[in-house]
Amino acid sequence: MTDQPQQLTIRRPDDWHIHLRDGEMLEAVAPFTSEICGRAIVMPNLVPPVTSVAAARAYRERIVAAVPAAHDFTPLMTCYLTDGLDPDEIEAGFAEGVFTAAKLYPAHATTNSAHGVTSIASIAKVLERMQKIGMPLLIHGEVTDAHIDIFDREARFIETVLHPLRQQFPELKVVCEHITTQEAAAYVLEGNQYLAATITPQHLMFNRNHMLVGGIRPHLYCLPILKRNIHQQALRDAVASGHRRFFLGTDTAPHTRDRKETSCGCAGVFNAPSMLSAYATVFEEIGALAHFEAFCSENGPGFYGLPLNEDKVRLIRQPWTVPESIRVGGNGDNLVPFLAGETLNWQVVL
């Protein structure tokens, strides 16, 4: 039996899917990502959503202002796709280095997605332009039809929306974000160089039993929702394979405690404070530490065509306890982070 490693040194990671929010929330959460990651793909679902180059540029400035001066961090901005979006706006933003990618939210699929796309036909000209210029499309892959069970919405999306979309635009770079099912994992594994996926720490660590058995755990509630253990295992198998088109995307999505612990709670897991330790825990459990650095730090830049980060991050085998809560602003609001109060064996050393 080989000795357990006592430390892990990896190239600085990137987070290819985060929600930073705005205002006091942005100021509270941004440092948890910027101290660990070199870059992050920032979701555009603000109110109002980020649909123009000017709005993305202004939001980027607010993010940079919220990042501590000592952190070397670059926010990568995205455009929120809407039915009426002008392809020229997308291309201008991409050419100017403001937009790194565009985000497809089916209307009403998740938080602040009311302005989302109602049909692929309505954005066909935008997708055609994105395919031409090599701009990635990031997809929240769930159908939103009321009669489709919430646990089936990702698999149905692949069948009825994603596969036809990729047939229509075969060279469009597509990232299936926060995949949660064996169908999605298999679809990416069977795909070509134009298809990739991000996977969150919560979907690797947990399944729906953890959220629902013995009491409802609202801080595990996110969209897409946690699925059966067979789907969790399929995700673990996918990352254990070392396949280069799966990479780190936390979907960290902060909501204050009062908006989570309520009769109609918000969807989202705030995992930025514990994410790298959580991923390391999973990769060790499944015997895949040999692929940990590639998943965190190499596969994403490889798909996006961006340079690798030059500096390193170190994790040591030293138990630490995730904070029970994190303060937001000066009004007594707080966040409950992913794995709050839990002890993890891998600790990031900065």
From Swiss-Prot:
The active site is at D251. Its EC number is 3.5.2.3. GO terms for cellular component: cytosol. Zn(2+) 1 binds at H17, H19, K103, D251. Keywords: Hydrolase, Metal-binding, Pyrimidine biosynthesis, Zinc. Zn(2+) 2 binds at K103, H140, H178. Pathway: Pyrimidine metabolism; UMP biosynthesis via de novo pathway; (S)-dihydroorotate from bicarbonate: step 3/3. The modification N6-carboxylysine is found at K103. It holds the Pfam family Amidohydro_1. The keyword Hydrolase applies. Coiled coil: none annotated. Binds 2 Zn(2+) ions per subunit. Its cofactor is Zn(2+). It catalyses: (S)-dihydroorotate + H2O = N-carbamoyl-L-aspartate + H(+). Catalyzes the reversible cyclization of carbamoyl aspartate to dihydroorotate. Homodimer. This is Dihydroorotase. It comes from Erwinia tasmaniensis (strain DSM 17950 / CFBP 7177 / CIP 109463 / NCPPB 4357 / Et1/99).
